């Protein structure tokens, strides 16, 4: 009897659904932990390492906050939202720092089930919310970016807008004071947590205002909600924002009858003026300027150098095909179609769900803007599927017993989640670095000072700074073409040029931090170098760096290290592209070849490689299509660490080299095909062959996973 009473209590049922959905989400995320724990190479400092490259930026910021300081201009994320939250968790919990950054996403991202279930409950459809929560919490896209070890702001980037959506819907349905104050609170938190959410917040507030003007134009509380929410967009300190919002909320709550529409109109106008004066609309004006005056911007760019566009090399901003798009959002194509149908049906039944459109549309931008955006559509589409299933149950109950209906719903839910479970099982993401790589960088921390620089590719910037506590030229947040040019040049040109550019780029980067805003150092460091060295032709200036008699006039202020990991061989052609581009035209008109491969098959005296090259079994030539190309030399690498290799000359007039790696730390790089230009690059000569000018460099860390060289000039 007591159990029946509990089951009749809607609040207990709602609470039970939230707990079950939350536990389900957390449990699914622990699968990766269980799997990764089998590999010692994924551990560092007695804990699994994280799988998010950008996560090391926030980890560095949190580490510096715990230490209480950081170096000037070190690009540390000191004081950022995720770093701050991590800092406080470290201070108030007994867990290690490594454990906190590993599991934060596991537990915080699973909170998405709460607003989903609460929102559905506002429509008196708890089943809709429960099913939607199960699906949304583990759908492919959301899982990929919030799984255990994915230490990034993504862990709350969907949770917070779903709470905003919930309070908007609740405000529409209940018109209560709690929603009135909670709405600006969560918008403010969202803007603090993820500043890039500004546009989405503007869209949500704008749509809420339009909805108000159409359906609730005579109800004052809705206009106050818009005003309070808009104040969070202002570019002033949070405590001033909070004070203004609380005062206006209190005035409305206590003097509601005296606040007529004229006063509300004045408040609204004052809010708009305040936003303009405080810089709250600057992001919108920037977007308008960028898109409306694009031709002017392009003209400005042509006055300087035209660098390689980094967006061409980032998978997250590549277009995604429609099948993959559907799978990432709903787990499978069929569930996506049902979800879309269900969402349209939900809109017809409950017009307030139109407030979800900005979130849904942002997710659909993935079709043009890249797969990273799909994460936004996940919870909204899941609500559509949950609604469809709840309607399906209502139909079943009319024809069959409650038990039969429940069994059908459970079965349908399991079928829906089956593709997601398969995805979770197969999605075995490796840690960003291996244990050996992390240990090497930790070793570098004991060699280098905090003011020293490590020159390496931007993919490794954040982890290098975290483990070695040094500075870098580039990282996951600073990697425009003009930034990437310098490490690309130092890695892909000859040693002399690499050494000179490493010194110049570091010293000029440091100088740029203290230069006036209109100084050329702020806009283009390469042009600043040329100006100081009285050079007007960029090609002649860059060529002069290869000459031994090139004299560096810039004073040496710190030590510089070159970090060359084995894993960079997989992307080295991309790395080199940034400095082989024609800076006057922006065209990659200096062709080069560097291609890693592994054997797929051996037949008829030929080795078929994964990069499409067919190599003769005597290694004397290779075929690309119908073209047979001679090989200059075969280089057999017996030991990268010891620098043991054997060069077998074949045709000294040929342009291509074949590297056969018998000692490779990268499983999918057994062969490397390269031309003479790449063969003479600093990366190939110094890392693979161990050839370096001892007047320019010292080898301070040596392993087959990575090598670190200290610049001597």
From Swiss-Prot:
<dbReference type="GO" id="GO:0016757">
    <property type="term" value="F:glycosyltransferase activity"/>
</dbReference>
<feature type="binding site">
    <location>
        <begin position="194"/>
        <end position="196"/>
    </location>
    <ligand>
        <name>[alpha-D-GalNAc-(1-&gt;4)]2-[beta-D-Glc-(1-&gt;3)]-[alpha-D-GalNAc-(1-&gt;4)]2-alpha-D-GalNAc-(1-&gt;3)-alpha-D-diNAcBac-tri-trans,hepta-cis-undecaprenyl diphosphate</name>
    </ligand>
</feature>
<keyword id="KW-0472">Membrane</keyword>
<feature type="short sequence motif" description="MI motif">
    <location>
        <begin position="568"/>
        <end position="575"/>
    </location>
</feature>
<dbReference type="InterPro" id="IPR048999">
    <property type="entry name" value="STT3-PglB_core"/>
</dbReference>
<feature type="topological domain" description="Periplasmic">
    <location>
        <begin position="234"/>
        <end position="237"/>
    </location>
</feature>
<keyword id="KW-0460">Magnesium</keyword>
<feature type="binding site">
    <location>
        <position position="372"/>
    </location>
    <ligand>
        <name>[alpha-D-GalNAc-(1-&gt;4)]2-[beta-D-Glc-(1-&gt;3)]-[alpha-D-GalNAc-(1-&gt;4)]2-alpha-D-GalNAc-(1-&gt;3)-alpha-D-diNAcBac-tri-trans,hepta-cis-undecaprenyl diphosphate</name>
    </ligand>
</feature>
<dbReference type="Pfam" id="PF21436">
    <property type="entry name" value="STT3-PglB_core"/>
</dbReference>
<feature type="topological domain" description="Cytoplasmic">
    <location>
        <begin position="348"/>
        <end position="352"/>
    </location>
</feature>
<feature type="binding site">
    <location>
        <position position="462"/>
    </location>
    <ligand>
        <name>[alpha-D-GalNAc-(1-&gt;4)]2-[beta-D-Glc-(1-&gt;3)]-[alpha-D-GalNAc-(1-&gt;4)]2-alpha-D-GalNAc-(1-&gt;3)-alpha-D-diNAcBac-tri-trans,hepta-cis-undecaprenyl diphosphate</name>
    </ligand>
</feature>
<dbReference type="GO" id="GO:0005886">
    <property type="term" value="C:plasma membrane"/>
</dbReference>
<feature type="binding site">
    <location>
        <position position="291"/>
    </location>
    <ligand>
        <name>[alpha-D-GalNAc-(1-&gt;4)]2-[beta-D-Glc-(1-&gt;3)]-[alpha-D-GalNAc-(1-&gt;4)]2-alpha-D-GalNAc-(1-&gt;3)-alpha-D-diNAcBac-tri-trans,hepta-cis-undecaprenyl diphosphate</name>
    </ligand>
</feature>
<feature type="glycosylation site" description="N-linked (DATDGlc) asparagine">
    <location>
        <position position="534"/>
    </location>
</feature>
<comment type="similarity">
    <text>Belongs to the STT3 family.</text>
</comment>
<feature type="topological domain" description="Periplasmic">
    <location>
        <begin position="428"/>
        <end position="713"/>
    </location>
</feature>
<feature type="topological domain" description="Periplasmic">
    <location>
        <begin position="145"/>
        <end position="152"/>
    </location>
</feature>
<feature type="topological domain" description="Cytoplasmic">
    <location>
        <begin position="1"/>
        <end position="11"/>
    </location>
</feature>
<keyword id="KW-0328">Glycosyltransferase</keyword>
<feature type="transmembrane region" description="Helical">
    <location>
        <begin position="261"/>
        <end position="278"/>
    </location>
</feature>
<feature type="topological domain" description="Cytoplasmic">
    <location>
        <begin position="216"/>
        <end position="220"/>
    </location>
</feature>
<feature type="transmembrane region" description="Helical">
    <location>
        <begin position="12"/>
        <end position="35"/>
    </location>
</feature>
<feature type="transmembrane region" description="Helical">
    <location>
        <begin position="325"/>
        <end position="347"/>
    </location>
</feature>
<feature type="binding site">
    <location>
        <position position="316"/>
    </location>
    <ligand>
        <name>Mn(2+)</name>
    </ligand>
</feature>
<feature type="binding site">
    <location>
        <position position="152"/>
    </location>
    <ligand>
        <name>Mn(2+)</name>
    </ligand>
</feature>
<feature type="site" description="Interacts with target acceptor peptide in protein substrate">
    <location>
        <position position="571"/>
    </location>
</feature>
<feature type="site" description="Interacts with target acceptor peptide in protein substrate">
    <location>
        <position position="316"/>
    </location>
</feature>
<keyword id="KW-1003">Cell membrane</keyword>
<dbReference type="InterPro" id="IPR041563">
    <property type="entry name" value="STT3_PglB_C"/>
</dbReference>
<feature type="topological domain" description="Periplasmic">
    <location>
        <begin position="370"/>
        <end position="373"/>
    </location>
</feature>
<comment type="pathway">
    <text>Protein modification; protein glycosylation.</text>
</comment>
<dbReference type="GO" id="GO:0004576">
    <property type="term" value="F:oligosaccharyl transferase activity"/>
</dbReference>
<keyword id="KW-0997">Cell inner membrane</keyword>
<feature type="site" description="Interacts with target acceptor peptide in protein substrate; important for extended sequon recognition">
    <location>
        <position position="328"/>
    </location>
</feature>
<feature type="transmembrane region" description="Helical">
    <location>
        <begin position="238"/>
        <end position="254"/>
    </location>
</feature>
<keyword id="KW-0812">Transmembrane</keyword>
<feature type="short sequence motif" description="DXD motif 1">
    <location>
        <begin position="52"/>
        <end position="54"/>
    </location>
</feature>
<feature type="binding site">
    <location>
        <position position="54"/>
    </location>
    <ligand>
        <name>Mn(2+)</name>
    </ligand>
</feature>
<feature type="region of interest" description="Interacts with target acceptor peptide in protein substrate">
    <location>
        <begin position="457"/>
        <end position="459"/>
    </location>
</feature>
<feature type="topological domain" description="Periplasmic">
    <location>
        <begin position="279"/>
        <end position="324"/>
    </location>
</feature>
<feature type="short sequence motif" description="WWDYG motif">
    <location>
        <begin position="457"/>
        <end position="461"/>
    </location>
</feature>
<feature type="transmembrane region" description="Helical">
    <location>
        <begin position="97"/>
        <end position="122"/>
    </location>
</feature>
């Amino acid at each position: 009897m007591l159990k029946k009473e509990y089951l009749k209590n809607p609040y207990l049922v709602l609470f039970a659904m939230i707990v079950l959905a939350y536990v389900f989400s957390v449990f699914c995320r622990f699968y990766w932990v269980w799997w990764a724990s089998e590999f010692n190479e994924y551990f560092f400092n007695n804990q699994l390492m994280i799988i998010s490259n950008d996560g090391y930026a926030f980890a560095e910021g949190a580490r510096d906050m715990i230490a209480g300081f950081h170096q000037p201009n070190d690009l540390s994320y000191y004081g950022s939202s995720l770093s701050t939250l991590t800092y406080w968790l470290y201070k108030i919990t007994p867990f290690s720092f490594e454990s906190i950054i590993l599991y934060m996403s596991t537990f915080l991202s699973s909170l998405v089930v709460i607003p989903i279930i609460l929102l559905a409950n506002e429509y008196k459809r708890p089943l809709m919310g429960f099913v939607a929560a199960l699906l949304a919490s583990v759908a492919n896209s959301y899982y990929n970016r919030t799984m255990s070890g994915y230490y990034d702001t993504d862990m709350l980037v969907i949770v917070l807008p779903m709470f905003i959506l919930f309070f908007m819907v609740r405000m529409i349905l209940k018109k209560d004071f709690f929603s009135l104050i909670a709405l600006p609170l969560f918008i403010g938190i969202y803007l603090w947590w993820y500043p890039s959410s500004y546009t989405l917040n503007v869209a949500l507030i704008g749509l809420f205002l339009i909805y108000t003007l159409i359906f609730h134009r005579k109800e004052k509380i809705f206009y106050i909600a818009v005003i309070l929410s808009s104040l969070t967009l202002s570019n002033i300190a949070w405590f001033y924002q909070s004070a203004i919002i609380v005062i206006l909320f209190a005035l409305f709550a206590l003097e509601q009858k005296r606040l007529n529409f004229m006063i509300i109109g004045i408040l609204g106008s004052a809010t708009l003026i305040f936003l303009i004066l405080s810089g709250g609309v600057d992001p919108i004006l920037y977007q308008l300027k960028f898109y409306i005056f694009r031709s002017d911007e392009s003209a400005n760019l042509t006055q300087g150098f035209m660098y390689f566009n980094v967006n061409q090399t980032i998978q997250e901003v590549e277009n995604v095909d429609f099948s993959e798009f559907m799978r990432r959002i709903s787990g499978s194509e069929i569930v996506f179609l049902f979800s879309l149908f269900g969402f349209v049906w939900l809109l017809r039944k409950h017009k307030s769900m139109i407030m979800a459109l900005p979130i849904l549309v942002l997710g659909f931008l993935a079709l043009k803007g890249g797969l990273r955006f799909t994460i936004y559509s996940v919870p909204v589409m899941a609500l559509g599927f949950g609604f469809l299933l709840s309607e399906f149950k209502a139909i079943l109950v009319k024809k069959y017993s409650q038990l039969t209906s429940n069994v059908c719903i459970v079965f349908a839910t399991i079928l829906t989640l089956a593709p997601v479970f398969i995805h979770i099982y197969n999605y075995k993401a490796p840690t960003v670095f291996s244990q050996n790589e992390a240990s090497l960088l930790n070793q570098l921390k004991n060699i280098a000072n905090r003011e020293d620089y490590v020159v390496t590719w931007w993919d490794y910037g954040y982890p290098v700074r975290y483990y070695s506590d040094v500075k870098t030229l580039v990282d996951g947040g600073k990697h425009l073409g003009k930034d990437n040019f310098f490490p690309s040049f130092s890695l892909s040109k000859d040693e002399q040029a690499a050494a000179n550019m490493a010194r110049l780029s570091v010293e000029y980067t440091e100088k740029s931090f203290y230069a006036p805003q209109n100084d050329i150092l702020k806009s283009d460091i390469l042009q600043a170098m040329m100006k100081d060295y009285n050079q007007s032709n960029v090609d002649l200036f860059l060529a002069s760096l290869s000459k031994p008699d090139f004299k560096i006039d810039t004073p040496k202020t710190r030590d510089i290290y070159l970090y060359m990991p084995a894993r960079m061989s997989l992307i080295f052609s991309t790395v080199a592209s940034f400095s082989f581009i024609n800076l006057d035209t922006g065209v990659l008109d200096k062709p080069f070849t560097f291609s890693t491969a592994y054997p797929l098959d051996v037949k008829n005296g030929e080795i078929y490689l994964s990069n499409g090259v067919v190599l003769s079994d005597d290694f004397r030539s290779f075929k690309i299509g119908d073209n047979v190309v001679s090989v200059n030399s075969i280089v057999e690498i017996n030991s990268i660490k010891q620098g043991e290799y054997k060069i077998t000359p074949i045709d000294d007039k040929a342009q291509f080299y074949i590297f056969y790696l018998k000692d490779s730390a990268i499983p999918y790089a057994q062969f490397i095909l390269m031309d003479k230009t790449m063969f003479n690059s600093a990366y190939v000569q110094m890392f693979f062959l161990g050839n370096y000018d001892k007047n320019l460099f010292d080898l301070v860390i040596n392993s087959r996973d990575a090598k670190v060289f200290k610049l001597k000039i």
